[in-house]
Amino acid sequence: KYIGFDIDLANAIGEKMGTKVEVKSLGFDALIPALRSGQIDMIASGMDATPERQKQVSFTEPYFQDGYSVVVRKDNTNINGFDDLKGRTVGSQVGTKGVDLATEAGATVKQYDANSQGWMELQSGTCDAVVINTSVALYYMKEGGDKDLKIVGDAKKADAGIAMAVSKDKPELLEKVNKALADLKADGTYAKLYKKWFGVDPKA
């Protein structure tokens, strides 16, 4: 069973639309091709609605303003934010803005398919830091990751906002998903799910 804020939100959207959601797990790079070929109907995977991606898919209204944070081991005193990543080995998930941010900071970047690989490498010392969605970092810390790891420095904002994606061929689906999202925000479901996963209230 897959879990996460995105999954809970997707299921709640399905409920509002009166349809059952079936979750398929795919590598991040495979998501847009799968959507365009009709293999899946919607992407709910913390995807930044970037201008490049907007050429290929239709995005809903953003449901999350996320950023990217630097995470290091607790005993690390040399890395206190993005400015200290130059010349370091830094892990980040393939296809995400984290890779770009780490590269821009002058790091040697190791790319992972799954965030779990990043946590493992960080704990075993094969990378110095991980650049990851702030939301993922917050959740991981809340679930006990803060025993060994810490978030350092300020987060860098993800400009476009995080949104669900649907095929450009399905404008009616986009409309329904947007309406369901608006309803979930209005009836308090969204805030409840947000608090459940991140331990904080959503920023207005």
Residue ranges and their predicted role:
Residues 1, 10-19, 95-115, 141-146:
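Ligand-binding cleft/hinge of the Venus flytrap
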Residues 1-46, 187:
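Extracytoplasmic small-molecule ligand-binding "clamshell" domains
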Residues 7-16, 76, 94-96, 161-201:
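Extended ligand-binding regions for polar small-molecule ligands
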Residues 13, 35-36, 85, 122-123, ...:
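Hydrophobic residues within well-ordered alpha-helices
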Residues 18-20, 36-45, 88-89, 124-136, ...:
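Alpha-to-beta junction loops
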Residues 22-33, 77, 94-96, 110-124, ...:
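Short helix-initiation/N-cap motifs at beta->coil->alpha
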Residues 60, 73-89:
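Flexible hinge/capping segments at coil-to-helix
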Residues 65-72, 134, 138, 142-182, ...:
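Periplasmic-binding protein-like
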